[in-house]
Amino acid sequence: MMRYACLKRQRYESGPLAVIPIREADMELIRVWRNAQMRVLRQSRPLSPEDQKRYFRDVVMPTFEQPQPPMLLFTYLLDDHPIGYGGLVHIDWENRRAEISFLLETARSREDADGEYARLFSCFLGL
């Protein structure tokens, strides 16, 4: 598992839900989720596998070593199975501010799913 140098803990959990530093193994899942949910993202075209690998290599991987990275991305797990990803982006370390990024797997992203989206988002924020 990749480790963020700036974090003391690499796993945060509550019952069956957990977040861990984003994993290279989850890149393809995340790409599929992003392409299926472009309407809620700042993404103008579908990502190719090469686009995703390049982004992970050039943008995400360097953040693991940085003492104050511009973002912290996590894989969101339910019973150790990935159900989404997100984290803090555009981090302003000096003023202790950031934006939240959050995306659930497509099947769980429907807002009419008996409040599941709201519940999972709330739990994610708590982790």
Name these PLM-found stretches.
Residues 34, 59, 63-64, 126-127:
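Hydrophobic, Leu/Ile/Phe/Ala-enriched alpha-helical segments that form helix-helix packing faces
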Residues 112-127:
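Conserved acetyl-CoA-binding loop-helix of GNAT-fold acetyltransferases
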Residues 1-53:
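A short, well-structured alpha-helix characteristic of acyl/acetyltransferase catalytic modules
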Residues 29, 71-75, 126:
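Residue-level detection of beta-strand scaffold positions
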Residues 29, 54-58, 124-125:
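Alpha-helical elements of Rossmann-like donor-binding domains used by nucleotide-donor carbohydrate transfer enzymes
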Residues 40-46, 107-115:
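Short histidine-centered catalytic/ligand-binding loop motif
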Residues 50-109:
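Acetyl-CoA-dependent GNAT
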